[in-house]
Amino acid sequence: MQNMMNTSQSFQNDSVLIGDKNTLQSINKSVDNGSKNTHGITGIMNLGNTCYMNSALQALSHNYLLINYLFMNKKQIIRTLLTNARKIFKDCDNFKIESTISPIPLELRKKIQSENYHLSMLTVEDVNILLNNTITAQIIRLFECMWKNNCVVVPTSFRKVFGEVRDKFFFGYEQHDAEEAYSCIIQKMQEELAEKRTIRFKTTRHSVGEYIKYMNDVKEKVSCLPNGKEKDIVMNKFKQIKKQMPRESLTAESFREMKKYYEQGYSYITEIFSGYVHSSICCPNTSCGFTNDRFDAFTHLSLSIPVKNMYEQLNVYDCLREYFSQETLDADNLWNCEGCHEKVQAIKKTKLWTTPYVLVIQFKRFGMTRIAKDNRFINYPMDELDVSSVICSQQFEDSVQTKYKLQCVINHHGGLNNGHYFTYSKIENTGEWYEFNDTYTGKVTDNHIVNQNAYILFYIRSDLFRSQ
């Protein structure tokens, strides 16, 4: 361990260029096992109502952007997990010094709780214990086994760690939701691999760069001026420029908000699965015109299913339009405008701002009350999903990509209380679709993929998708 400490490089202060094509190209490859046989056709044993977990694992294990990142960066990932060990485990019951029933050795618990914690304090045994208690290391180990041989794996170790997260939300043998499993796995990997980095964004618009430079110059100038007339003159001029360059101003604001989000804890998991939505609320008073802009990250879109005539066919675009439709804030939901300080009837608009590498779409078949399941058929494209119709009209960066190809479908068969989850996944290096249904695996034809049981769709951006 000491030898690893001496030879490894620290990455804590590296800067990251979000959306860097060079990084993408390095992992944008098929999983290669040195064999001409198709690999990754592995079943997962159901350990007692764990089909929800198995289906999420199969979807993630056949996401080649994720798989290649995990496999090709294993050493750095392990180092990050060990570096972050105190942050990951210091609030975990098993790692508390006062615990009387913890399976973790007392000496290791003391190291984790120490404010002076460092990798050099760890023994080989410590390293193994720590890694065995992380979702990320367990999922790498599981996926390596799944891709090494076409077999059936029994995910006992992963299940044990997975059952401990979210205050043991998944503990026991109750049925849960596949979306909850997916979200939990991604969130835990983000947390475990989070690093402080300096984040940069590259604009494709010269005017945006000029605006950001001007804005920074104004901030520097204002910071040196005393409160008074001269400062007011500078700020009033800036406000005029801002009004004249609304798109540049909004883009600069988005960079600022996204920078904060990524710098709170950067990981490549976040970059793969995260996109941004832009919400705006505008005051209707012509004398005011104040607009509140907000940018929010997402790792999946949870889409309501519109109410339609029973004879009208639904498609994923109907659901996207419903999700991104404008909302009137009236009656008991009046908006308190920060500009005129009045409660007004305003319009809230929400649109996509940036698109993730992997777009995950959930159909809300169970609703808020979970009284019944909506079994209606929803059509969705396999070869090209184009989300350009729900991109914010103020977004004018050329780098925003809007077309996707389907990679995976998590299906839910049956009713609300007696359903079963299984997965259709595309094997990226052959283009063939397979069904993964707990221990069962088998080829399926394309006409099976778009089906009434579809619950969660996984799309990969077309500009990242390898041609067959």
UniProtKB/Swiss-Prot annotation:
Catalytic reaction list: Thiol-dependent hydrolysis of ester, thioester, amide, peptide and isopeptide bonds formed by the C-terminal Gly of ubiquitin (a 76-residue protein attached to proteins as an intracellular targeting signal)
Keyword Protease listed? The answer is yes
* PROSITE patterns, sorted: USP_1, USP_2, USP_3
Q: Tell me the keywords, alphabetical order.
A: Hydrolase, Protease, Thiol protease, Ubl conjugation pathway
Question: Domain named USP: which ranges?
Answer: 42-462
- Coiled-coil zones: none
- Name the CDD domains for this protein: Peptidase_C19R
GO molecular function terms listed in the Swiss-Prot or TrEMBL record: cysteine-type deubiquitinase activity
Q: What EC designation does it have?
A: 3.4.19.12
Gene3D superfamilies in UniProt: Cysteine proteinases
Is Hydrolase tagged as a keyword?
yes
Can you cite a GO biological process for this protein?
protein deubiquitination
Top-level taxonomic group: Viruses
The active site of this protein is located at: 51 (nucleophile), 420 (proton acceptor)
Q: Which InterPro entries would you find in this protein's record?
A: Papain-like_cys_pep_sf, Peptidase_C19_UCH, Ub_carboxyl-term_hydrolase, USP_CS, USP_dom
Q: Which family does it belong to?
A: Belongs to the peptidase C19 family.
| Name of the protein | Probable ubiquitin carboxyl-terminal hydrolase R319
Biological source species:
Acanthamoeba polyphaga mimivirus (APMV)
